[in-house]
């Protein structure tokens, strides 16, 4: 691999100052897509002999951007047009008022945004960042790009053409010296971090993980339910104990929905709309099957550690390891690493095919794998992976000549990422009797069929569905996008959340109840100052998936709650939440317009929030039966936009 | 996408905070609460101060009070007037900003018996509620703060300030910050990120524009939120394909609930292309084995409950 000294500039180990040809690729990623984009951009730069660093935004300082030849930002949008959590520290440091307009002069950047056009604030995070970078004097050297999750070819549909253009730009503006060529795609870029066996003797002194037997909870659970403890030193995480894992839909119903209760010993507080993240694990069976396929039986249960491949490189040049704080995992074996960290059930990205093509010598397999990485075969790639939801494990079964060196496991497989779940508890449900925090979740277990015979299962919900109460999990608490103020909680509200979308709304309803109760305690006999709430709920059948029906009864008097329901399969004609809103348009108009109420829309992204938005606009147009002049279409639309601007229309969909 | 070159002004946009509270107890003090748009109309402001004596009158911007940027002196004002315009021209703007946070800041700054009024003498339902919640009493024109001593107003304390009174259940606490959000930067020192984008940005097309049209010869895909029926069509195709595949397998005596064995080395039972055994990545469009794992020629395949067991 003669061309592969690309990134090391081995001849000149001089000071880390601005090297002649360096690239920094930074990302703000919530679900991992922006990180994938960053990694693909990074690989491209490295192949063009840029000394390349890839990092999450929170790990870089704005002041350091200047020292790179080029900086590429890959940023997704979350919440109400916000930057992802792992970019917000950086972002806030850019928002400082005192920064002069020359603060970033000399910084040469481009950017790529990832968004979902079913959100009104499509790609706002990237656009805000772009504007702020310009305000602070940075130079956009290549026009940014934007990907849309709703695009028919997914993110790739816009990313691939953008990347091709950027590559051309780099070659034009930063030509390679005569005699030097880009590293071809079929030459593997050596991984920066590799696994090494640890000295087993010395390592034996490590503390072994605490006994898995915690407070065992008895009860009737299928054998598939296991008691599991989570030992991962995950960033900013809390150890939670699962105290309930209850199926709330009938066994006969097509969908398995779980009502989970988790407790934490610390008195953590949270607000409606906040989100809990859970990082799943792989099953022991899947990992065993991978170990056998790869022929790793000999190393599987030996202690390993993650080390830089090239220990001579200065730490400045060394990108951060693919997994953080792995050192503090108690007695890490290859098997534990596979179970806890590597996403072997992920739907692979194109870069995965490029990586594993290096690990087979069987021409037929190699050729096909490389075809899948070719943008011209995007359709076939999509038909083979995303469309049928084919996992890495299944692909390795099929391409069984691929033998990944175990040392490269962390650079070949994606890292298991955390999944977000809206918290369903609020008010008095937020605390345990002994002063700890309590979290409730409502989770639909993901199972579906594609053209692949074997039923598809969601990695995280499968992990959750088999946990026996008493198990521990590492959870992270994140602030959500609903940001309902106390004023909004006691004010008139319209809550729209079909299916498990009702979770964050339930949190709000219990929060309202707690406000009313505490007011009543202090002012006995006085009518609590609470305005009416309309909950619009939708499901398939009242009998099967009307979650928390009893609670709504219980809460309705306390907080002036009116529940409107739409059960699509309970009558011949399908009825959805938007239909119920339409039927009640004057009620809606009165609550939202006359009373100045706020709307919260939660649930699946895509069609539902769009239909709701449309129906609300219509309600503003036609719902005014007070006889005053009706809104025109334009005015109704403007009114909705106005609500959005003033935080009276909030959407949290997933 | 014209680069908007904005230098950042760090001075408060409209600073007329009480210069000192020396005259706090001499004469009647008035607090004017203005919607931000008034700041652009100097003449309007000048007229105001002909009506209200500058020396006993403070002006605050509603949005700044609402955002908690302003601390008002306690028990100081006899009149708080919301500048809705005498003809109500600024009513909607002003009232929109007259939120709970404003009451929380303003009511303690009012003397006992002080009045809260709007220029056009209008209070909507929402304002009424908030004012009452804040412990004010409705009067003919606006609201009044009860004199302490004769009948105490009961302000609804909804968290926020949790110093006094050991509340039995802390109802609202600041949201937890466990994510990496917690730098030490005060919001005060930051620009408002929402000002970075305008309404035009909302409408800005995606760059580069999406190529939704299918390319010639390429299979068409449905968008994630497909409404045109393509998604359903594709799903139906997939189902059909799966069923067709099931059927072809059954022709070869592979009942899905039977434990059947199939020897792929037997003539006529393997696809003519010879690629079937390699897996979906190599199978052709109508392959009956689509969706089944790869197998070795000669390997026994059992189909148990619709799942191939290799």
Swiss-Prot record, chain A:
Catalytic reaction list: 2 oxidized [2Fe-2S]-[protein] + NADPH = 2 reduced [2Fe-2S]-[protein] + NADP(+) + H(+)
Amino-acid positions noted as binding NADP(+) in the UniProt annotation, renumbered to this chain: 500, 568-569, 574-578
Function: NADPH-dependent reductase which is a central component of the cytosolic iron-sulfur (Fe-S) protein assembly (CIA) machinery. Transfers electrons from NADPH via its FAD and FMN prosthetic groups to the [2Fe-2S] cluster of dre2, another key component of the CIA machinery. In turn, this reduced cluster provides electrons for assembly of cytosolic iron-sulfur cluster proteins. Positively controls H(2)O(2)-induced cell death.
Positions of region (Disordered): 1-22
GO cellular component: cytosol; cytosolic [4Fe-4S] assembly targeting complex; mitochondrion
Domain FAD-binding FR-type, first and last residues per copy: 235-485
Binding site for FMN: 29-34, 76-79, 114-123
Low complexity compositional bias, start-end: 1-10
PANTHER family referenced in this protein's UniProt entry, alphabetically: NADPH-DEPENDENT DIFLAVIN OXIDOREDUCTASE 1, NITRIC OXIDE SYNTHASE-RELATED
Major location (coarse): cytoplasm
Binding site for FAD: 389, 419-422, 458-461, 654
Protein name, UniProt field: NADPH-dependent diflavin oxidoreductase 1
Provenance organism: Emericella nidulans (strain FGSC A4 / ATCC 38163 / CBS 112.46 / NRRL 194 / M139)
CC cofactor: FAD; FMN
Chain ranges of the Flavodoxin-like domain: 23-167
Compartments in which it is found: Cytoplasm; Mitochondrion
Swiss-Prot record, chain B:
Motif Cx2C motif 2, residue numbers: 284-287
Keywords: 2Fe-2S, 4Fe-4S, Cytoplasm, Iron, Iron-sulfur, Metal-binding, Mitochondrion
Quaternary data: Monomer. Interacts with tah18. Interacts with mia40.
One Gene Ontology biological process: iron-sulfur cluster assembly
Free-text function comment from the UniProt entry: Component of the cytosolic iron-sulfur (Fe-S) protein assembly (CIA) machinery required for the maturation of extramitochondrial Fe-S proteins. Part of an electron transfer chain functioning in an early step of cytosolic Fe-S biogenesis, facilitating the de novo assembly of a [4Fe-4S] cluster on the scaffold complex cfd1-nbp35. Electrons are transferred to dre2 from NADPH via the FAD- and FMN-containing protein tah18.
Region listing for Disordered, in residue ranges: 1-30, 165-184
Gene for this chain: dre2
Cofactor(s) needed for function: [2Fe-2S] cluster; [4Fe-4S] cluster
Region (N-terminal SAM-like domain): 24-154
Fe-S binding site B, as annotated region: 273-287
Pfam family, any one: DRE2_N
GO CC entries: cytoplasm; mitochondrial intermembrane space
Domain-level remarks: The C-terminal domain binds 2 Fe-S clusters but is otherwise mostly in an intrinsically disordered conformation. The N-terminal domain has structural similarity with S-adenosyl-L-methionine-dependent methyltransferases, but does not bind S-adenosyl-L-methionine. It is required for correct assembly of the 2 Fe-S clusters.
Motif, Cx2C motif 1: chain positions: 273-276
Protein name per the record: Fe-S cluster assembly protein dre2
Entry-linked InterPro entries: Anamorsin, CIAPIN1, Dre2_N
Binding site for [4Fe-4S] cluster: 273, 276, 284, 287
Composition-biased stretches (Pro residues): 167-177
Molecular functions per Gene Ontology: 2 iron, 2 sulfur cluster binding; 4 iron, 4 sulfur cluster binding; electron transfer activity; metal ion binding
Fe-S binding site A: annotated span: 212-228
Region (Linker): 155-202
């Amino acid at each position: 691999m003669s061309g592969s000294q690309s990134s090391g500039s081995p001849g000149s180990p001089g000071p880390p100052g601005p090297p002649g040809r360096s690239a920094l690729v930074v990302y703000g990623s919530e679900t991992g897509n922006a990180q994938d984009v960053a990694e693909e951009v990074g690989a491209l730069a490295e192949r063009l002999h840029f000394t390349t660093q890839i990092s999450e935004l929170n790990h870089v300082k704005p002041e350091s951007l200047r020292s790179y030849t080029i900086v590429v930002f890959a940023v997704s949008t979350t919440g109400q047009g916000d930057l992802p959590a792992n970019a917000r520290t950086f972002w806030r440091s850019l928002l400082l008022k005192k920064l002069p307009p020359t603060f970033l002069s000399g910084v040469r950047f481009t950017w790529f945004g990832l968004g979902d056009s079913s959100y009104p604030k499509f790609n706002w995070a990237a656009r805000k960042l772009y504007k702020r970078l310009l305000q602070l004097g940075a130079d956009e050297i290549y026009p940014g790009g934007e990907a849309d999750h709703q695009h028919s070819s997914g993110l790739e549909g816009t990313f691939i053409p953008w990347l091709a253009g950027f590559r051309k730009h780099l070659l034009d503006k930063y030509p390679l010296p005569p005699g030097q060529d880009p590293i071809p795609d079929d030459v593997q870029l050596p991984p920066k971090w590799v696994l090494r066996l640890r000295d087993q003797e010395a390592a034996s002194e490590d503390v072994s993980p605490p006994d898995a037997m915690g407070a065992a909870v008895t009860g009737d659970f299928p054998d598939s339910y296991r008691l599991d403890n989570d030992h991962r030193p995950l960033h900013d995480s809390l150890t939670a104990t699962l105290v309930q894992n209850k199926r709330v839909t009938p066994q006969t119903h097509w969908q398995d929905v779980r009502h989970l209760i988790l407790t934490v010993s610390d008195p953590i507080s949270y607000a409606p709309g906040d989100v809990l993240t859970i990082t799943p694990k792989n099953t022991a069976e899947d990992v065993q099957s991978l170990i056998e396929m790869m022929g790793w039986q000999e190393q599987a249960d030996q202690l390993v550690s993650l080390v830089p491949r090239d220990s001579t490189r200065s730490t400045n040049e060394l990108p951060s390891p693919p997994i953080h704080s792995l050192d503090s995992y108690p007695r890490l074996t290859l098997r534990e690493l596979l179970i806890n960290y590597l996403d072997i059930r992920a739907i692979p990205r194109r870069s995965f095919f490029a990586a594993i093509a290096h690990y087979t010598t069987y021409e037929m397999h190699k050729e096909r794998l490389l075809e899948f990485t070719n943008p011209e075969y995007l359709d076939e790639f999509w038909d083979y992976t995303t469309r049928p939801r084919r996992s890495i494990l299944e692909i390795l079964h099929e391409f069984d000549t691929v033998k990944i060196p175990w040392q490269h496991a962390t650079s070949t497989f994606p890292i298991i990422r955390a999944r977000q779940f809206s918290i369903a508890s609020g008010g008095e449900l937020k605390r345990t009797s002994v002063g700890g925090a309590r979290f409730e979740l409502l989770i639909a277990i993901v199972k579906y069929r594609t053209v692949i015979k074997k039923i598809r299962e969601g990695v995280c919900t499968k992990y959750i569905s088999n946990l026996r109460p008493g198990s521990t999990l590492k959870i992270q608490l994140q602030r959500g996008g609903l940001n309902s103020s106390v004023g909004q909680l006691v004010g008139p509200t319209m809550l729209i959340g079909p299916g498990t979308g009702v979770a964050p709304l339930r949190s709000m309803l219990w929060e309202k109840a707690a406000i009313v109760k505490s007011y009543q305690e202090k002012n006995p006999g006085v009518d609590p100052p609470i305005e009416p709430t309309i909950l619009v709920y939708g499901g398939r059948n009242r009998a099967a998936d009307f979650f928390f029906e009893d609670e709504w009864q219980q809460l309705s008097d306390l907080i002036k709650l009116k529940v409107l329901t739409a059960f699509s399969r309970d009558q011949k004609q399908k009825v959805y939440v938007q239909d119920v809103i339409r039927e009640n348009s004057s009620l809606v108009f009165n609550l939202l317009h006359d009373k100045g109420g706020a709307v919260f829309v939660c649930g699946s992204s895509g069609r539902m929030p769009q239909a709701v938005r449309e129906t609300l606009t219509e309600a503003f147009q036609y719902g005014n039966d007070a006889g005053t002049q009706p809104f025109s279409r334009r005015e109704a639309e403007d009114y909705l936009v106005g609500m959005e601007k003033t935080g009276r229309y909030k959407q949290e969909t997933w | 996408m014209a680069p908007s070159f904005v230098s950042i002004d760090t001075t408060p946009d409209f600073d007329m905070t009480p210069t000192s509270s020396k005259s706090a107890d001499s004469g009647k003090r008035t607090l004017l609460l203005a919607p931000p748009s008034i700041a652009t109309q100097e003449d309007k402001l000048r007229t105001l101060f002909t009506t209200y004596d500058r020396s006993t009158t403070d002006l605050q911007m509603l949005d700044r009070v609402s955002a908690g940027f302003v601390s008002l002196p306690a028990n100081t004002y006899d009149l708080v007037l919301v500048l809705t315009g005498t003809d109500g021209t600024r009513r909607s703007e002003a009232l929109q900003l007259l939120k709970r946070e404003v009451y929380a800041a303003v009511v303690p700054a009012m003397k006992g018996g002080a009045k809260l009024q709007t220029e056009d003498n209008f209070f909507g339902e929402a304002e009424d509620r908030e004012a009452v919640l804040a412990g004010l009493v409705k009067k003919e024109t606006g609201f009044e703060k009860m004199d302490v001593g004769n009948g105490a107003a009961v302000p609804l304390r909804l968290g926020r300030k949790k110093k006094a009174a050991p509340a039995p259940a802390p109802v609202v606490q600041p949201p937890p910050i466990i994510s990496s959000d917690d730098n030490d930067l005060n919001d005060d020192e930051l620009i408002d990120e929402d000002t970075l984008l305008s309404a035009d940005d909302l409408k800005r097309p995606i760059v580069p524009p999406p190529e939704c049209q299918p390319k010639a010869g390429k299979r068409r895909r449905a968008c994630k939120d497909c409404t045109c029926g393509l998604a359903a069509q594709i799903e139906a195709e997939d189902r059909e394909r799966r069923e067709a595949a099931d059927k072809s397998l059954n022709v070869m005596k592979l009942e899905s609930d039977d434990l059947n064995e199939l020897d792929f080395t037997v003539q006529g039972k393997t696809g003519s292309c010879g690629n079937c055994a390699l897996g979906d990545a190599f199978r052709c469009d109508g392959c009956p084995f689509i969706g089944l794992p790869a197998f070795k020629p000669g390997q026994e395949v059992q189909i148990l409950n619709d799942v191939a067991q290799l």
